[in-house]
């Protein structure tokens, strides 16, 4: 019995050596950045961290009752990106976490005039950044992009800025870009990186009779040899989807003499590229084959004629 008591006292002494979770923080006491906007103006880097309310994402057993909670947008400014981050800290009321950033949005002004090497250094050295973040560009003020809401008071987390792959599965209008792809292409001399550009629009949605702002993809910005080259608009990128092996589903309007005759859904492009040098210049020939479904034809048409019309339409793209 004495041995058991001595053993118990011996074990009790070790309890005082155990560490506790004294530095643990409750989730509501930490500010989690959802999207990070980066701009460049008057030789200063400006960051715009976007914060969202996670309570609108909670699962409810009864009828959904989502209370409207707009995104909160911070701002920091400095000669360097790190300096801008510490400038933002001055007004932060709680600890800020950079570990769960879903996407980065940079302005065209930053791509043209900012230091892209500094951006890569900023994202590489800070251990909380993840390489799986989505990368976007924009020509619009970042406040407009980051403040755009979602329908039914659904969290801003569920937008194309954070989940672009959801809409791409239904209609492949753009090829979303991950940070690890951007960084790997950035150091390749022969690679051109296409950054999808975001814009706001009121053309497609209304809340009752009131125009409702939503995000959309509208063009690409191109980077080559570590410098911003130019942007490509809707008409310029019309054929890009057919050169992307990840295109799962994309529509094509069939036309004959500028008259719409049908709608096809094309998918799973197979691309065979051949490169040759002629008179000292490279020539590239691409043979593309796709699977497709005919969704609508305005009048009966043989399959071989549909294929012929399709080939003509694709070449024009």
Curated annotation (Swiss-Prot):
InterPro entries: Spore_GerAC-like, Spore_GerAC-like_C. Keywords: Cell membrane, Germination, Lipoprotein, Membrane, Palmitate, Plasmid, Signal, Virulence. The keyword tRNA processing does not apply. GO terms for cellular component: plasma membrane. NCBIfam families: spore_ger_x_C. Belongs to the GerABKC lipoprotein family. This is Spore germination protein XC. It comes from Bacillus anthracis. The gene is gerXC.
């Amino acid at each position: 019995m004495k041995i058991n008591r001595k053993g118990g006292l011996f074990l009790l002494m070790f309890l005082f050596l155990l560490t506790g979770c004294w530095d643990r923080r409750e989730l509501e006491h930490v500010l989690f950045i959802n999207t990070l906007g980066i701009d460049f103006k008057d030789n200063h880097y400006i960051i715009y961290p976007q914060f969202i309310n996670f309570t609108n994402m909670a699962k409810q057993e009864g009828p959904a009752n989502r209370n409207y909670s707009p995104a909160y947008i911070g701002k920091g400014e400095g000669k360097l990106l790190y300096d801008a981050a510490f400038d933002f800290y001055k007004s932060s009321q709680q600890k800020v976490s950079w570990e769960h950033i879903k996407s980065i949005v940079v302005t065209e002004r930053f791509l043209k005039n900012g230091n892209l090497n500094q951006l890569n250094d900023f994202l590489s050295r800070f251990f909380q950044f993840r390489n799986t973040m989505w990368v976007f560009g924009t020509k619009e003020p970042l406040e407009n992009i980051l403040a755009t809401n979602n329908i039914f008071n659904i969290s801003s987390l569920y937008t194309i800025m954070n989940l672009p792959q959801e809409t791409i599965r239904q209609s492949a209008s753009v090829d979303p870009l991950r940070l690890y792809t951007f960084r790997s292409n950035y150091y390749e001399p022969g690679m051109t990186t296409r950054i999808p550009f975001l814009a706001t629009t009121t053309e497609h949605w209304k809340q009752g009779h009131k125009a409702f702002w939503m995000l959309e993809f509208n063009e690409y910005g191109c980077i080559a040899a570590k410098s911003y080259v130019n942007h490509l608009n809707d008409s310029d990128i019309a054929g890009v989807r057919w050169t992307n092996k990840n295109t799962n589903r994309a529509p094509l309007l069939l036309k004959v003499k500028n008259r719409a005759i049908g709608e096809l859904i094309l998918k799973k492009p197979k691309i065979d590229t051949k490169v040759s040098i002629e008179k000292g210049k490279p020539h590239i020939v691409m043979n593309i084959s796709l699977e497709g479904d005919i969704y609508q034809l305005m009048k009966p048409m043989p399959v071989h004629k549909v294929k012929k019309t399709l080939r003509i339409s694709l070449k024009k793209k």
